[in-house]
């Protein structure tokens, strides 16, 4: 019996830039999914997860099944298929898992699960031959093809590596980054407003679809291939172009936030983080589905009232529901947490600790 762990992730900068092969700043955090696993003699994977019904999936047929979109066993089959395509080995295993990540709660439970499954296959059948970067790509492929969600690579890469990482996906650049918030006198927090990303795949998928449509106007497949000056010279009214404008501004902001961390410049980082949050709200518009759950919008409004002039706040991850990320002086966090939990319930607001941050 072997033990495994896959962390959740927090997106620090680069909101909806990864699916356009843009730039991202993300990090693994100190909560995730733990499991014990052992080989089986057959080609079945059986997973028992605390709080969920156990499931068994056969590895004999790894073709894409649209009926399994959104189901965890689809991710198992997808990761297994990618390992085989890469020349690896697969086989059955039994796993007992316990997750500290709420499904749809904003710390990328699906990516953590993909990385966990990849690590189990890697250890039990491949002697650890696959790198974290390869496992991240296997997870992304599983999510795109088998799970039916058009995610970029940010979630999986952050979950697969330890600590903070800067990604320039167009350039193929992956760099470790120090994110010493505590040493900068800051506390990073996440407030779960109670909404869930589950069931919001269509709203999420509309964002990359809009961005791809703008890119094609300029003869490109992704916005990272489009000259920002060319776009702004020919910008058209409408949501798709607003989302493209967000991409170009956010993509330029990511290395600036990386550099602010390197200098431990708290004031500049907070300024840029607030600019990221405003861009998501005003241009990307991934806060609320029309007529849908408004808890994320209310959470951002609360954070604004509490932290204006003191800290920074932004939508976390895919948006439309889920979590508010906030950064503030350490001395301000107790009062902030008390106020947010008064609105969203006990335990809804927690400090996020980045693994390997210092």
Description of each model-found segment:
Residues 1-9, 13, 34-71, 166-314, ...:
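C-terminal nucleotide
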Residues 25-27, 157, 324:
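His/acidic/aromatic-lined binding-pocket segments of jelly-roll/cupin-type domains
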Residues 22-41, 161:
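Structural signature of FAD isoalloxazine-binding scaffolds in flavoprotein oxidoreductases
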Residues 320:
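Glycine-rich phosphate-binding loop
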Residues 111-112, 323-328:
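FabD-like malonyl-/acyl-CoA
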Residues 1-10, 14-23, 68-182, 307, ...:
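Gly/Ser-rich oxyanion-binding loop with an adjacent helix/lid
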């Amino acid at each position: 019996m072997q033990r495994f762990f896959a962390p959740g992730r927090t997106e620090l900068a680069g909101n909806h830039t990864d699916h356009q092969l843009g730039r991202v700043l993300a990090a693994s955090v100190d909560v995730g999914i733990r499991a014990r696993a052992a080989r089986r003699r057959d080609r079945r994977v059986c997973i028992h997860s605390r709080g969920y019904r156990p499931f068994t999936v056969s590895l004999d047929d790894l073709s894409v099944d649209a009926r399994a979109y959104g189901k965890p066993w689809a991710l198992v089959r997808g990761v297994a298929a990618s390992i085989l395509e890469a020349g690896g080995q697969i086989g059955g295993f039994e796993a007992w898992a316990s997750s500290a990540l709420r499904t749809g709660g904003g710390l990328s439970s699906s990516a953590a699960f993909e990385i966990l499954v990849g690590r189990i296959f890697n250890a039990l059948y491949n002697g650890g031959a696959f790198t974290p970067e390869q496992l991240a790509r296997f997870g992304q492929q599983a999510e795109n093809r088998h799970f039916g969600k058009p995610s970029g690579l940010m979630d999986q890469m952050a979950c697969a590596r330890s600590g903070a990482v800067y990604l320039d996906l167009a350039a193929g650049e992956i760099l470790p980054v120090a994110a010493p918030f505590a040493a900068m006198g800051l506390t990073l927090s996440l407030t779960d407003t109670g909404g869930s990303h589950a069931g919001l795949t269509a709203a999420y998928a509309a964002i990359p679809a809009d961005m791809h449509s703008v890119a094609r106007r300029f003869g490109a497949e992704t916005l990272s291939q489009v000259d920002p000056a060319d776009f702004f010279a020919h910008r058209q009214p409408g949501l798709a172009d607003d989302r493209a404008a967000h991409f170009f501004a956010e993509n330029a902001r990511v290395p600036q936030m990386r550099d602010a961390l390197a200098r431990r410049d708290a004031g500049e980082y907070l300024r840029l983080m607030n600019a990221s949050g405003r861009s998501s709200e005003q241009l990307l518009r991934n806060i609320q589905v029309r007529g849908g759950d408004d808890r994320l919008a209310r959470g951002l409004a609360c954070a604004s009232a509490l932290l204006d002039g003191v800290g920074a706040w932004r939508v976390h991850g895919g948006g439309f529901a889920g979590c508010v990320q906030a950064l503030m002086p350490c001395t301000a966090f107790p009062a902030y947490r008390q106020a947010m939990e008064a609105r969203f319930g006990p335990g809804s607001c927690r400090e996020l600790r980045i693994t390997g941050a210092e």
